[in-house]
Every structure is written in C-alpha cells, then in structure tokens.
Amino acid sequence: MFKKLDPSPKWIVYDNNPVMHKPIEDVVFPLTKEDEHVISQMLSYVDASYEGEADKYDIRAGIGIAAIQLGCPKKIIYIHLDDKNGEHKYLMANPKIIKESTSKMYLKNGEGCLSVKKDHKGLSIRKSIVWVKGIDLFTNKEIEVKATDLLAACFQHEVDHNNNKFYYNRINESDPYYVEKNWEEI
C-alpha cells in the first residue's frame, strides 16, 4: 500500500505558498491512490530523517510532517521520533486534539518547520499534555494517544498545520522569549 521512496527537498511546500493557507479536508475512506502516494512521501521523508539519512538525500531533517506540507490539503500527519519514553511512530488521518492540560511548556531551543525556510526566533508555547484521537493508518483503527513532552509538542505542531497555523503563530510577538515560572522547559 505505501511505498518506500527516495525523499526529495522538492516535495516540500513552503509557508508563503497559498496552498498552505487553504482549508484542509477530512480524509474519506477508502484512501485514494493520491492519498497513498502522499503518505508514501510522508513516511519516506520523515523515516529518512529518523534513520540519519537527511544529508544523503539533501533534505532538512524533521520528526513530523503534515500532508499539506506536500501540497495535499487532507488531514494526515506522520510523526516518528525518540524521546525519554522511547520511540514513537504515528500515522494518523483526521487527528484531533480532544483534551489538553492547563499546564504549558516550550522547547528550550524553539521549534522549526520543514515548510518554513527562515527560522523565527522565540518560543512556541504549547500545552504540556494533549490527548489526540484519529485513525491509525497502519492499523485502520481509531486510536487515542496521550502525549507528553516532545511528542505532545509535535502533535500540536502537526495538527496546527491542519488548521493553517505555523509554530511562529504561537510565539509572543512583543516578547518572543517570554515564559512564566510554572511553564515546563523541554
């Protein structure tokens, strides 16, 4: 169903492209051939990054991607990362954050994005814990994931793409490095 491809930097659509600001559609099943091709690209791109092969393919390394970043306006995300809790690998259709903590966090080095050429300085403030529901495209079953730390930030980042938002939209414009004492640094 999904094919391993050689990832290309030409696949990535940037934030200044009007496609990135159009409404994103829910995925309807069964998947189309186009859906399967885009998912193959998503898996190939992020897995090459995960396996340390970004330089080999001259791509910018990433831990997550949304279908819209490849020009496909459908709610599909793929995350593949390691953190203190181990390896995480999620390919989801129609992901939705259904619950979130009141506590907040930020990544101490800030965030980046495959679709943003010029990095924006500052801290993207995120919820510390999120519960995400969607269709697991590896099993074709609905799942609910409780995510914390880097995984929570990544889910929020990718779901933001489905709402035409970027990490820099979460940076305080007047004080980009503003934090409160009770916010957790990741």
Curated annotation (Swiss-Prot):
The keyword Protein biosynthesis applies. Keywords: Hydrolase, Iron, Metal-binding, Protein biosynthesis. Fe cation binds at C113, H157, H161. Its EC number is 3.5.1.88. It comes from the Bacteria. The keyword Protein biosynthesis applies. It catalyses: N-terminal N-formyl-L-methionyl-[peptide] + H2O = N-terminal L-methionyl-[peptide] + formate. Gene3D superfamilies: Peptide deformylase (3.90.45.10). Coiled coil: none annotated. SUPFAM superfamilies: Peptide deformylase. InterPro entries: Peptide_deformylase, Peptide_deformylase_sf. PANTHER family: PEPTIDE DEFORMYLASE. Belongs to the polypeptide deformylase family. This is Peptide deformylase. It comes from Malacoplasma penetrans (strain HF-2). The gene is def.
